[in-house]
Every structure is written in structure tokens, then in C-alpha cells.
A protein has these predicted regions:
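Active-/binding-site microenvironments in catalytic and ligand-binding cores
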Residues: 1-183
Length: 183
């Protein structure tokens, strides 16, 4: 249901569209409304998620809409995000607790920011080899919800980067790749 319209930005009472955040780009897709389809070109927000759509549309607050995400794009982001967790976890283990302090996830490439470390070519080759080895093993990837306290009880604080997350976020998604957990 449409709850707010400002220019070409539409807020809904609920959405499956992922907004820009956590180093990951937003979902694209369409909204199907009573007067046709609208292309969703950008999604932003925290408390209120705003879907940017084509400039010309006929919608009013209270209209019922359904959304369809571009699943190919979403799935590419999911795979890149999982790969980021794998690389970050292995780097942490190989290089004395190096922290991932940022990342940027796209459909076809990603960037991971580590601190404190200056990688040598030899270190990068070792990291690449370990990551490729884990991928070749076809390890199972699972996720689970845990609270901050539960995570802090099983993982060292420097591993979780809990200090980089807003304090109001209490429930977190924990990714397990094989036996290795990351968040």
C-alpha cells in the first residue's frame, strides 16, 4: 500500500526492495499499480524506504501495489556479498585479525577495505589461493539470526565490527560458510 508520495519517490507500508546500505547497491524492478507498471530505478532509506520511479505516473496514497525485483541483479548481489564474507573471514584468519572496515558490492565487482594492513603481492596470492580452495570445496552456506549479545559470546569483538553498526540494530544475520561464521 502506498503510504507517501513526494515527487517521483514512493513509500510503501512494506517492501522487498533492498535499499542502498551496508556497502550494497539497491534493488531494481517494477511496481505494479492500478494504472500500470512503474520502473523502480533507485531505493533508499532506513525508517521509510523510498522507491524512485519514472517521472510520469498515476498513483495516490492508499493505492495497492505489488513489487517485482530484478532477481538476476539481486542474486548477483547475494553472491558478491557471500564472497565478501568468505574473503573477509579468510583474511581475518590468515593475517592476525585484520578487520574489514568497509566494502562496496556491485553485480560484477566488489571492493573490500581492510585495516590495519598493507598487502604484499605474496599475501594477496595466499588469500586468493585460500579463497579459491574454499570455493572449490563447495561448502554449504547457511544463515541464522542472532542478537548482539549472542554474537559477542561466540566471536571476538574485533571480528564482528559491532562498533561499525548503528546501536539500534540488535538482531543480526550471521552467515556460516562450512564451519566458519561471519556477519
Amino acid at each position: 500500500t502506498v503510504t507517501k508520495i513526494e515527487g517521483n519517490k514512493i513509500a510503501l507500508d512494506q517492501t522487498l526492495f533492498y535499499p542502498l546500505g551496508g556497502g550494497q547497491n539497491w534493488d531494481l524492478g517494477i511496481l505494479n499499480g492500478p494504472n500500470g507498471q512503474l520502473n523502480v530505478t533507485e531505493v533508499r532509506g532506513r525508517d521509510t524506504i523510498e522507491h524512485t520511479v519514472d517521472d510520469v505516473f498515476e498513483l495516490e496514497v492508499g493505492d495497492e501495489v505489488t513489487g517485482e525485483i530484478d532477481f538476476e541483479r539481486r542474486y548477483a548481489h547475494m553472491k558478491m556479498h557471500t564472497a565478501q564474507h568468505l574473503v573477509s573471514g579468510i583474511a581475518y584468519e590468515l593475517f592476525d585479525g585484520v578487520r574489514t572496515v568497509g566494502n562496496q558490492i556491485h553485480t560484477d565487482r566488489s571492493r573490500i577495505d581492510f585495516h590495519p594492513i598493507q598487502f604484499t603481492e605474496e599475501m594477496l596470492l595466499e588469500l586468493q589461493s585460500e579463497v579459491n580452495d574454499k570455493i572449490q570445496q563447495g561448502l554449504e552456506v547457511t544463515d541464522s539470526q542472532m542478537t548482539r549479545d549472542e554474537i559477542n559470546a561466540i566471536m571476538p569483538q574485533e571480528r564482528t565490527n559491532m562498533d561499525l553498526l548503528p546501536a539500534f540494530i540488535n538482531d543480526l544475520l550471521v552467515i556460516t560458510i562450512g564451519e566458519q561464521q561471519d556477519m
